[in-house]
Design a protein with these regions (language model features):
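Short, solvent-exposed S/T- and G/P-enriched segments that are highly enriched in secreted/extracellular
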Residues: 65-72
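Short Pro-Gly-centered beta-turn/loop motif in secreted/extracellular proteins
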Residues: 72-80
Length: 138
């Protein structure tokens, strides 16, 4: 069973655009459980810090990614998450809260997804947040 979900979300005031795609993979054997994984790519000239937050509360993971870099976050359990993102370049710092997403990680399958972040000067969508809100880990 494979599902492909594409999401395009504009993030940050000069607008960091995060696009996501998710594939759910079926596991034929119940002998082991594969971890879910989300690959994060920074397609901008900004250094970004992405906080993966549990919707039920609390910080799950933080990744700081340099310009044009990438990283991954592994998940051992299913859950609902969202991102808080900070983009920095010189004296400019932008903060946004991203849309929610679901991660599936069970004996019968797991999520493998991708988030790509872009910084664009064409408007913004998503929720702007303050530095204080970004710094909170709950």
């Amino acid at each position: 069973m494979k599902k492909l979900i594409s999401i395009l979300t504009a993030v940050l005031t000069l607008s960091i655009v995060a696009s996501a795609s998710v594939t759910e993979n079926s596991v034929e054997y119940d002998l082991y459980q594969q971890n879910a994984v989300i690959h994060i790519s920074n397609r901008s000239d900004y250094t970004i810090t992405v906080k993966v937050m549990r919707i039920s509360g609390g910080l799950y993971a933080t990744r700081t990614i340099g310009p044009r870099g990438s990283s991954s976050v592994s998940f051992e359990k299913s859950g609902d998450f969202y991102t808080k993102t900070k983009a920095e370049k010189g004296l400019e710092t932008l903060y946004k809260k991203g849309s929610s997403f679901n991660v599936y990680c069970e004996a019968d399958g797991y999520t493998e997804g991708a988030l790509e972040f872009y910084v664009s000067g064409y408007g913004s969508s998503g929720q702007s947040i303050s530095r204080a809100e970004f710094e909170k880990n709950y």
